[in-house]
UniProtKB/Swiss-Prot annotation:
Family to which the UniProt record says this protein belongs: Belongs to the PRA-CH family.
Keywords for the protein's UniProt record, in alphabetical order: Amino-acid biosynthesis, Cytoplasm, Histidine biosynthesis, Hydrolase, Magnesium, Metal-binding, Zinc
Protein name: Phosphoribosyl-AMP cyclohydrolase
Chief localization: cytoplasm
């Protein structure tokens, strides 16, 4: 993207973060939710590759940097309240660190959370653990 929109006008939380939902651009499948700060959003818009902020590691998380499961960004949309982002991406491989295609594999059924999809790849293969 040649010129970035004004990212300061977005409504970040007290930690300076905004939720970002990644959706497969051609199927509409919701892949994951992660956090972005102004810098990671600027990088995403500039490079066309998803970059998030990892709250657990307290650092930038360039999707696919260790697993190879990159998200190429086709579009970034902002909701009407300016407090949530939607990234339309082309997911290469799996999106979830569990080896599943998306992170939403648990479904409320009969009073508990049931696993509805199996991993497509062993997480140890993804991260070399």
């Amino acid at each position: 993207m040649e010129k970035l929109p004004d990212l300061a006008t977005l409504k970040y939380n007290e930690q300076g973060l905004i939720p970002a939902i990644a959706q497969q651009y051609d199927t509409g499948e919701v892949l994951m939710m992660a956090w972005m700060n102004q810098t990671s959003l600027a990088e995403t818009l500039s490079t066309g590759v998803a970059c998030y902020w990892s709250r657990s590691r307290n650092r930038f998380w360039r999707k696919g940097e260790s697993s190879g499961q990159v998200q190429t960004v086709k579009a970034v949309r902002l909701d009407c309240d300016k407090d949530t982002l939607l990234l339309l991406v082309d997911q290469q491989g799996v999106a979830c660190h569990t080896g599943r295609h998306n992170c939403f594999y648990l479904e409320a059924q009969d009073g508990s959370w049931k696993t509805i999809t199996d991993p497509e790849i062993d997480p140890e293969e993804l991260y070399g653990k």
